[in-house]
Amino acid sequence: MPQLNSGGGDELGANDELIRFKDEGEQEEKSPGEGSAEDLADVKSSLVNESENHSSDSDSEVERRPPPRETFEKPRDYLSEAFRRQQDAAFFKGPPYAGYPFLMIPDLGGITCPMVPSHPASRAYLQMKWPLLDSPSTAGLKDARSPSPAHLSNKVPVVQHPHHMHPLTPLITYSNEHFSPGTPPGHLSPEIDPKTGIPRPPHPSELSPYYPLSPGAVGQIPHRLGWLVPQQGQPMYSIPPGGFRHPYPALAMNASMSSLVSSRFSPHMVPPPHHSLHTSGIPHPAIVSPIVKQEPSSGNISPNLSRKSNVVVKKEEEKKPHIKKPLNAFMLYMKEMRAKVVAECTLKESAAINQILGRRWHSLSREEQAKYYELARKERQLHSQLYPSWSARDNYGKKKKRKREKQSPEMENYTKTKKMCVQHFPSDKSCDSPASSHGSMLDSPATPSAALASPAAPAATHSEQAQPLSLTTKPEARALSHSAAFLASKSPSSSSLSGHLPSPVGASLLSRPIPLTSSILSPPGVFPSALQALPLLQAQPLSLVTRSSD
């Protein structure tokens, strides 16, 4: 506990402390002796002084706030009452602020303890234990609500009424000295400091961090921000502005003190120390949340400017009229003949109409085409006169840019899906599809006549079943050529079929992947079945023949 040597005196407490009279049940707790008569005299003198000093106050306020006593024995009543309330355990609700952990001391004279006798020596010890409250009796009789600067700078701090109190006064601590964590409990025996010879203060863990000054504060749980809104019935100390100020008042209670207080009381009852405001009322810079200044940087401005410039350029380009290139000879011919072709044909597709126009253009003679070439030359001359600075590159570049802007997301998705298809499908068709490995199906089809040659052979391969009918269906000429090949390949020997076949037919047969159970590995006796199936091959498409054979 911080100690302060002030000019001594008889006043040991504030004039707002609570005093219990003998008729309230304290006479039984005190030791019988000489203290009773002295206490009665003290009470009478304090009442006279209070009536003289606070003539403007009402009787209720006088009863609520009796002045302090001026003799050495005056802390006994207060301390006994504090100890009784401590025993009742009705007041330990937690301190409203952590700056006053030493303001309530148990009654040292009222307890029957062998180490603390109830005689004047203990009272002298109590006076030494409260050096901060020592002041002359004449200075303690001044009005508590309007203390003079001299009184505040040198003497005891007096209790102010709540509505006269500055809201930041409870944050000002007594001293910047810290509590010694290793001192044993000092309320049992007075410990004298070997350096100064002054008795040490009691241990912080044995003291209540709250100072009960009025009966209205009994049993009330103070608000966490009660130091900002002073309430009636909860008077607080006004501390002298000079000499006792701590640079960070809420941090005056060190870690050992906070641990001792929290060990005595439950965590939800002891609020954490407030560290929000400085003594001057200005928030500390380390506590205030930093506000980042939003200064515009060059990196943030440049993209916006570039975007704006791009938008302006695009708008200017859009405002310019699109100049078409001059028509060539074929375009002039299409422009002239398109209406005739549409009238002659019932087709409405532009692609088909363009094909017809292209065939007719190539069927024209040179003389007829020369007429349109001459018209195209005149068109170019007129265009160059109208637009001298125009070039075909302008339109070409614009169109390309527009296509990239419009089709960039779609083309990306399209290419992704197309790659997926390329990855999945070739693995199925690369080996068993003749179209992928040996050219188109029209040139070298997988013939189902080989399957007809052997009834036990499968009807068609997997690739043939997967392909549409348009690829597997062949005209009658194809069927006749294949049947002729089989007729020419008829031989009683079973050595090698490709040696007796004609070279193109043998190559076409061997170049296709044929199942192992096909006609090549079958005995030659099954070939008459192929001859019997020739009328069917000539009359029906191949796809229908293969399905009927299944």
From Swiss-Prot:
Residues 407-550 are annotated as: Interaction with CTBP-B. Residues 323-391 bind DNA. Its main location: nucleus. The keyword Repressor applies. Keywords: Activator, Developmental protein, DNA-binding, Nucleus, Phosphoprotein, Repressor, Transcription, Transcription regulation, Wnt signaling pathway. Residues 444-463 have a biased composition (Low complexity). One of its GO terms (biological process) is canonical Wnt signaling pathway. GO terms for cellular component: beta-catenin-TCF complex; chromatin. Residues 1-76, 182-206, 390-473 are annotated as: Disordered. Residues 1-60 are annotated as: Interaction with CTNNB1-A. Signal peptide: none annotated. Residues 17-32, 51-76, 406-415 have a biased composition (Basic and acidic residues). Residues 1-11 have a biased composition (Gly residues). SMART domains: HMG. PROSITE patterns: HMG_BOX_2 (PS50118). It is found in: Nucleus. The keyword Repressor applies. One of its GO terms (molecular function) is DNA-binding transcription factor activity, RNA polymerase II-specific. Phosphorylated. Phosphorylation by csnk1e promotes binding to ctnnb1-A while phosphorylation by gsk3b may reverse this effect. InterPro entries: Catenin-bd_sf, CTNNB1-bd_N, HMG_box_dom, HMG_box_dom_sf, TCF/LEF. Residues 464-473 have a biased composition (Polar residues). Residues 108-311 are annotated as: Interaction with AES and TLE4-A. Belongs to the TCF/LEF family. Interacts with csnk1e, ctnnb1-A, ctbp-B, dact1-A and gsk3b. May interact with ase and tle4-A. Participates in the Wnt signaling pathway. Binds to DNA and acts as a repressor in the absence of ctnnb1-A and possibly ctnnb1-B, and as an activator in the presence of these proteins. Required early in development for the establishment of the dorsal body axis in response to maternal Wnt signaling. This is Transcription factor 7-like 1-C.
